Amino acid sequence: RDYYASRGLGDVYKRQAPRLNGARLPSDWEAQDYPPRAGREAHGPNWDTVADYRACLEAVRPATNLILFAGHNTLRKGVMGDAPRAATPDDIATMTRNLEQALDEGAWGMSTGLVYHPGVHSRPEEVLALATACARRGGFYATHMRSEGDHLLEAIDEVLALVRATGIRAQISHLKTSGRANWHKLPEALARIEAARAEGLRLHSDRYPYLSAGTDLDIVLPDWASAGGNAAILRNLEDPAARRRIIAALDA
């Protein structure tokens, strides 16, 4: 009871795009979350779309199977740049069209990183609209939720509401309880997911089996310090007053 059996797995979730330099990919690359469209991460020397990227992959002949996801942050950047604001109806309509193109060209679904910029500025209705379009085409939804710490349970509830509304198949990526003050929330987090599955929702989650974590350093900065992307971060780090505010927030 309360134990799970699984085949041996490597790291089945990779965000980085493989370098398309003619080499076979490393054997630990089991899955690939690659954004398809119009943002900095989406572009390369030979591709702008999922169709272009697939053609490049086929030329490289990778050694592993790859699954492509349309990244919400890249969809957002392609329409809104790094603007720290809510999306307008026109913004959402354009993102939806770009997502549908990516899905039609072979993306397996949509992924979100709602603790990262610019996704941190999105409202639930924006993500819901895109997930609805994804569900219509049979796509999958993989999410880095809005919180893995102080608001973990509320973030899980947002995912559950989205899955109930759309019927989409979903995965909570890297389920964790970040921060000692939140460690006690794990049983309740798992209970909510199990209850949703018993209800009939097609929802799963994964946890990596190690204690450390790795991500972009800007994740530890207060939202105001990183709003506007890397250029804004550098300006704030160079400004003595802003730097003192950042240090105070990190020490709090």
Feature names for model-found ranges:
Residues 11-108, 201-203:
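Divalent-metal coordination cores built from histidine and acidic residues
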Residues 1-13:
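Single conserved hydrophobic/aromatic residue that forms the stacking wall/gate
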Residues 101, 107-159:
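Divalent metal-binding pocket/active-site signature
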Residues 52-55, 97, 125-136, 157-161, ...:
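Alpha-helical scaffolding segments of alpha/beta enzyme cores, especially the outer helices
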Residues 186-252:
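Hard-cation-handling environments
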Residues 71-73, 113-117, 146-148, 175-178, ...:
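Active-site beta-loop-alpha junctions enriched in small/polar residues
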Residues 47, 86-93, 117-122, 149-153, ...:
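Active-site glycine- and acidic-residue-rich loops that bind
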